[in-house]
A protein has these predicted regions:
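Elongated, mostly alpha-helical coiled-coil "stalk/stator" tethers of large membrane protein machines
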Residues: 1-182
């Protein structure tokens, strides 16, 4: 089977189970922490792929990575099932699929604003309000500081990207000069 098919099946099952128990929000928060742990700590994935490590140790590692050892019963049972079925190498993809499914179900958009310096909270609130007005859903914003922009900002939401950075404008002017001088 393909990674995507397996991951999506397990993610749908986790979402249905969490919905049934009324803990989908808690599981979503824990899944976000776990996904972040997978990206920050490559050794976590290596430990899960290790066939010598017992399932109990892997369960403890995952619970620790998902919330300091205190995770919801639903996520814990899900991880136990994944370990029992020996599908732990797909766990990262299952968690990412769960996050995507949850966001679709709750109509949550993820936006990112990249600037040279920190953005005031009131500016982020105004942008969030505009996006909520257009999407009729909830918006999760991340802000990133990148000194290479030299000024301006880059705004991303879903597949839409607005690049109003000085670095991008300089790049466009440079391309126009090159095109005219050929």
């Amino acid at each position: 089977m393909y990674i995507g098919v397996i991951s999506m099946r397990y993610a749908k099952a986790l979402l249905a189970y969490a919905d049934e128990k009324g803990t989908e929000d808690t599981v979503y928060e824990e899944a976000g922490i776990l996904a972040d742990s997978f990206s920050r700590i490559p050794e976590l994935r290596q430990a899960l792929d290790n066939p010598v490590l017992p399932a109990e140790t892997k369960l403890k590692l995952i619970c620790e990575a998902a919330g300091g050892g205190q995770v919801s019963e639903e996520l814990k049972r899900f991880v136990e099932l994944v370990l029992e079925e020996r599908r732990e190498k797909f766990l990262q993809f299952m968690i990412m699929s769960y996050i995507d499914l949850y966001r679709k179900q709750k109509n949550i958009s993820v936006g990112k604003i990249t600037t040279v310096c920190p953005v005031a909270e009131e500016v982020v609130s105004r942008i969030r309000a505009l996006v909520v007005e257009k999407t009729h859903g909830t918006v999760e914003f991340k802000t990133k500081i990148d000194p290479k922009l030299e000024g301006g900002f880059i705004f991303e939401i879903g597949t839409y990207r607005l690049d109003a950075s000085v670095a991008n404008q300089i790049k466009r002017v440079k391309q126009q000069f090159i095109a005219k001088n050929r």
